[in-house]
């Protein structure tokens, strides 16, 4: 998609801070390597060294559209917010799965169980996805922060662009033809409920809310000419600004012109005939009947309204691709010279490589038992080799780069271990396991008197539970983080730890990437000498990094021998620590605690409690309310209020809060249904 005409504004970082510590050297070397044409570059950035800011300054140096990949939605949202603050005049977009809930279509042959696709789409995230693709086809100063969603099938960018509608003032456009065009690209006419992806008509005035906007476009006709174009507020109708030209992109990524659609229908019919003949020849009459009914229904929907449920399963025909070929993805919307940055690459790279087989194993059953045509197999994520072919130059960022990244870069990497704050890596103390719990309690009490927090990591769930009980008996405020706690509760637990509602967090795997806890001054690793996944070199370095954001950060490893993994982690931490101390001494830097970040968190909590629209504590308060004694009208009002709050939270990218509110709403609706069933409603 390099031949599309895009506006060409410059990337510009706007920040009160200048690159500091290792950042200037890292930015310069990364820029030099990319400018020399090196395809794969690794940034080995220690925890808390400002890798996100380095990425922003690198983008400013390179002046190229950039894809930034993160391992999950939460980290992607965090990165997008950071980059928006650093690049306020450029388009920083967010592209992740738009499902709040997703149950994929599946068939379990052993029990003859068909599971229909079931999902709940987050309207705001879908809007952000459309905004990402529309920005990529309109301008060059675009950064898209994405999860692995970017390797899943999407409509082709050429069809998406070709089916867009360009409006210009004084241009001759027949109003009724324009309305038909809007319907063709999946906009719905709704003169009452005016929402995203709809349009309304009042005489010679047509209002549209594009799929990627929060504002509406007003088109005023004078006869068959466009008299004026405005952006307006969708609720009040107030004019925001007048413009001379507007491009309206389709309301779905899966669009095709009439000729392409007609050809796709014929291709699907031809494939259906061949597949039915094959199934009948093999005596699979039930499967053949099942496939005929489903496909003919889908074809009728496509012919009548240009769309059907699960249309993505026919994407190969809609795109005009040969069998077995890779689908179009978000990567195809970028210009050819785009840059890719993979954050937490030691997690993200294996994710990319594993998506194809997981998807394929489910779909093979659907095809074999007559639920889908074989072409549905081509609606899939990219294979690793296909991903490699589509991305150009790539920067891998991680505190512990994986073997693949290091091999791809020839074993070379750019190092960023000096923190702008002057904080150094924690000291590591190896102690014997004999009497380790009493020693740990002594260390915890020393920290709690200074209002500092402690993380304790164990090897088994049973050990974590027993340790938590024992610490509670000894008067220590402690919580236990385990696999039964969902993501939202986990975020709440960590927030409570930061705010000092308790002092010690015990868990099995506390090394999760992006765990930012500046108040933690001690990380205790029990059974550090038991080799395995949880005590590998990478795991130990990640766990040690949790104490690297505190001035007095310390790590205690309880072990009776020093394993190879321990030795490497200790040596690497000591090497970084010596380098950091020498730098601080040379430049007269006194390590500063991250007080500002803590204040920001406290401020956000206080603000959210004060706001009536989205208080972070609402979900907790509601769950404690005795809703069974609440009048039905009041309960319905509460559900409506929480739904509004959920929408507000999602628009502000506060997905943890939105998810918590969603769960509360589901519980309240269940309560309401119970009342209706017994005649209280």
From Swiss-Prot:
This is UvrABC system protein B. The keyword ATP-binding applies. The UvrABC repair system catalyzes the recognition and processing of DNA lesions. A damage recognition complex composed of 2 UvrA and 2 UvrB subunits scans DNA for abnormalities. Upon binding of the UvrA(2)B(2) complex to a putative damaged site, the DNA wraps around one UvrB monomer. DNA wrap is dependent on ATP binding by UvrB and probably causes local melting of the DNA helix, facilitating insertion of UvrB beta-hairpin between the DNA strands. Then UvrB probes one DNA strand for the presence of a lesion. NCBIfam families: PRK05298.1 (NF003673), uvrb (TIGR00631). It holds the Pfam family UvrB. A motif (Beta-hairpin) lies at residues 98-121. The beta-hairpin motif is involved in DNA binding. Residues 607-616 have a biased composition (Polar residues). It is found in: Cytoplasm. Residues 636-671 form the UVR domain. One of its GO terms (molecular function) is ATP hydrolysis activity.
